[in-house]
Each structure stands twice: as C-alpha cells, then as structure tokens.
Amino acid sequence: MEVQELFLLALAISLDAFGVILCIGINKGITLKSSIIFVFSFGFFQFFLSFLGGYIGTIFNKYIVPIPTIVGGLIIIIVGILMITEGFKEKEESIFLNKIMYLILGVSVSIDALVIGFTTLSYINNLFYLFMSSLFMGLIATIICSLGIILSKYIKKISIISSYADYIGGIILILFGLKMLFF
C-alpha cells in the first residue's frame, strides 16, 4: 500500500473520532487534561485496533466484519442518549469526566480501524510494516482529533452552541451511531 493510500485510509477512519471529539470539546465541563487524554485514547485505539485487525484479519475476516460496526454504532448511540439526558440535569460534572469514557469512546470510534485492519492491512506479511502502517494510522487520528479539540474551543464561544452543547453533541453522536449501523 502506498503512503498516499494509507494516509487517505487513516483520514477516512479518523472522521468518526473527529466528530465525537468535537462533541466532547464543546461540552462545558471538559478540561484540557480530559481533552488530551481523549485525543491520545482515540489515537492509541486507532493504532492498536488496526494492528490487531491486520494481525488476525485473514483468519476472522469472514465472520467478524459486521459485528464491530454494530457494536460501535450502538455504543455511540448510547453515549449520545446519555449526553442528552445529562443536558436535562443540573450537574456539577460532565459525563466525559468519568474515566471509563476514555476507554469506551476510544474503542467505539476505533472499531472501524479493526475492520480496516481485517480487510485492508491483513495482506501485510511483515510484522514491522504492519506495525508502522498501524502506527501511522494512529498518528493521523491523534492529529485529526487534536484539530477537533482546537476547533471545538472556537465553536464553544458561540453562545447558542454553548447553551445547548449537551443536546447538540448528543444528537450528533446518535446520528454517527445510526450511520455506523445503517450506512
């Protein structure tokens, strides 16, 4: 696989993470530390799951491809619903400050990387090249998510978005989840 193809593939699978990180970034209670942890969580899981998928892809490709998309979509929909319900509550702390969310969202936005590993990277026989290709995909996801956090800080300054961030973010996450399930 050429570098340009790998870059476009990495960019494509990073878009879900970008959308989710925007929703996280506009949330009122999110801290800089939490944002950084989410960015690195998303990047790490993009790397790890694409590597894992490539490593065992030829064996399980036929049986597992549809399952990760369904699970990832459902998880993101559930998080979207939780975000909307958080908007109705008077809260002192954001749902995203719960440490388990780093893992849950990191894995759920990276499940497509597992599928890409199964289908696209599984032909790479050299473990070093597979590792480097997966690492490149994780790096691209980290950069894209960093840009999403920066962009969300500007979006958050728009008063109507700031006022309804939980609802907007929740609806966007539900739409992402539905996209993963049906498209």
UniProtKB/Swiss-Prot annotation:
Its main location: membrane. The keyword Metal-binding does not apply. It is a multi-pass membrane protein. It is found in: Cell membrane. One of its GO terms (molecular function) is manganese ion transmembrane transporter activity. This is Putative manganese efflux pump MntP 1. Keywords: Cell membrane, Ion transport, Manganese, Membrane, Transmembrane, Transmembrane helix, Transport. The chain crosses the membrane at residues 6-26, 36-56, 64-84, 100-120, 130-150, 158-178. It comes from Clostridium botulinum (strain Langeland / NCTC 10281 / Type F). GO terms for cellular component: plasma membrane. Pfam families: Mntp. Belongs to the MntP (TC 9.B.29) family. Probably functions as a manganese efflux pump. The lineage of its organism: Bacteria, Bacillati, Bacillota, Clostridia, Eubacteriales. The keyword Ribonucleoprotein does not apply. The gene is mntP1. InterPro entries: Mntp/YtaF, Put_MntP.
